[in-house]
Amino acid sequence: QPLRRALAIYEDKMNTVDVMREYNEFERKRINSFNGVKKTDSNLTKFVSNNRHGSYISFFSFDESLTESIVKEQLAYFNKLNLCFEWKTYSTDKPTNIGDVLLANGFEKEASESFMVLDLSKTVGESFDESQITEVSDSVGIRDAIRVQEQVWGGDFDWQYNYLLSLKEHSPDSVSIYVVYVNDQPVTSAWLTFNGSSPFAGIWGGSTIEEFRGNGYYSLLLNKRIAEAKSKGVKYLIIDASDMSKPIVSKRGFEIVATTTGYTSPNS
């Protein structure tokens, strides 16, 4: 019996290597290029934003001996355009010396997050109060969603606003944006993205203004997005989970696939 139970648990466990391979193929190499352009060569895929902020290296794979020259090449490319960019890395990426080389070239390391995946075929929907959620799709509503992010994280999120607005205008089915209002004040915002025929949907945002935390708004929007992704027949739901959100999403069945760390360019 114990052996059978152990085998059942083993069989039920997500094959994280396969999931990461699929994610690289469908999400990191095939990116939405609204409010910017996607550029690909044999070494990497990048998104070049129309705004000063918002550009990033999405996928990369090359020999360790080339790391220094490729990093310098990308720095020169974005500097020429006067753009800041993020080099997003995963613990499964090659070459493994990428982090050290980025730091040596003046990049700033951001806080690492857990890249987590939920197999939607194995999750059960939870009931939630739909009446507390407002879906936004126009410039005013999207601005409200971004205002929450700016208050929580600090800084200018205009690039994020422009990206979401452009995505909603040009490919409305690719993104669903949600806000929780309390007395007409936006206090929590989050969005859900779909990428064509990709088996992955992504949950982003998920932030609540400090004085309104502890009311279940994060879980409310999490449950809404799980239900929507499941209803659209998507296979996996992904999140870059901070230490604060990791215990909440773990309870819903999300599993850690990798650690993800962003490095911001020196001119940011």
Question: Over which residues does each language-model region extend?
Answer:
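A conserved beta-turn-beta hairpin within the catalytic core of GNAT-like acetyltransferases
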Residues: V48-S58, F194-I203, R213
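Helix-loop element at the rim of GNAT/NAT acetyltransferase active sites that forms part
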Residues: L81, V148-W159
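A conserved beta-strand-loop-helix scaffold within acyl/acetyltransferase catalytic domains
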Residues: F157-I209
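Conserved acetyl-CoA-binding loop-helix of GNAT-fold acetyltransferases
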Residues: E68-L75, G205-T208, G214-A227, S231
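Acyl-donor-binding surface of acyltransferase catalytic domains
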Residues: R4, E11, L66-Q132, S137-V140, ...
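A short, well-structured alpha-helix characteristic of acyl/acetyltransferase catalytic modules
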Residues: S139-Q151
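N-terminal charged segments
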Residues: P2-Y77, L81, K94
